[in-house]
Amino acid sequence: MPPGSWWLVLWLPPLATLPAGAVPQEEAAMSVPRCKSLKETDLIKTSVSDCYCYNQHSQIEWTYMWSTVQVTVTSPGLLSIVYITGRHTCQHTETILSFLKCVTHNFWTAEEAKEVTIVFSPYGETVCFSVKPVGSLLTYAVSVNRNVVDFRLFLVFATGIFLFFYAKTLSQSPVFYYSSGTVLGILMTLVFVLLMTKKHIPKYSTFGALMIGCWFASVYVLCQLMENLKWLWCGNRIYVLGYVLVVGLCSFSACYSRGPPADEGSRDLLMWALRFLSLVLVYTGMAISQFAYAVMILLLLSWTRHYLLRAFSCLRWKVRQWFATRALVVRYLTDDEYREQAEAETASALEELRQACCRPDFPSWLAVSRLQAPKKFAEFVLGASHLSPEEVSTHEKQYGLGGAFLEEQLFSLQTESLPAS
């Protein structure tokens, strides 16, 4: 594999995965034959610890691009969910990206709760899980609902589209810089502090390792807070508001002291980061991965269309130069050039006529018999001018400057330009 292409391992294998219901998912489902099959709008109430499987749809429909399946397990007492097959077991993952997603999900999944909600795509792999009540067996309910349009999923997709097309504008906006910095400081304090202290870290490798650790830690804390958001807001509202106010002011002060990026390199880096984030949001905001890949490719093509058009126009211009014949360039003569060429061509033609008349085979008697002025023709053959002084004077009076022909042309143009009465 050439250097710099290692990231393809994370993305190319999902393109070749089999659709839901293919051999890998069927084998996984057959490994737990006693599990009950779940369908949409199912409502199961039982007090027996059992396992359940939801078989994914094999036929893809474009109307369900933002649909999700929600399985809710509720009980008066504590219960736990154990995944048997699927992406949450981390045993049959084919790519590094799938393994990281599996480990991350299992890392912040709540182990014990009275209500557990599982949300997944209806076009993924088969999901099997078992419900194990903690302590004494109590009656619990398993309900399955399908959201045709999950507005949270659609909101993530729309946000990705907006970020992609307005990444350059947002990277140059001071308002976006201060607002995004404040929000980042509130939601991901560790990442914000690391970015503020970047200049004090000499090695990029150390900074990269710290960034990965701070990012995963911030995501874990954020997911834990989102799961307990209702409890935090009801019981600790004052502390939540105090944290948001204090950390928000500190984050805004830090961003204000540093100021928005002034150099072009920092702005370009922020623009590329926003566009990469937009592609991630587009991918995570669609339930069908094939459609997500198609939208991402269309976005990249729309972004690079002016580069492609410019390259195509340059190629077409080169090909036209190679194969097309050069067009003739026509230049019009000036009055002086026209007069000079006319005099030269006339003198050359008259000289050719003299030479032709001096040839032995020239029928001189026949020519003399047809001429009105044979003496003038003989003088012309011997070297005299072909025009007499009287003819030259008459021509100048008729066609020269101030002549009758020129005056007639001028007066006729003026008459045509006058409006009709």
From Swiss-Prot:
It is a multi-pass membrane protein. InterPro entries: NEMP_fam. One of its GO terms (cellular component) is nuclear envelope. The keyword Transmembrane applies. PANTHER family: AT07567P-RELATED, NUCLEAR ENVELOPE INTEGRAL MEMBRANE PROTEIN 2. This is Nuclear envelope integral membrane protein 2. The gene is Nemp2. Keywords: Membrane, Nucleus, Signal, Transmembrane, Transmembrane helix. Residues 1-22 form the signal peptide. Belongs to the NEMP family. It is found in: Nucleus inner membrane. The chain crosses the membrane at residues 147-167, 175-195, 206-226, 232-252, 279-299.
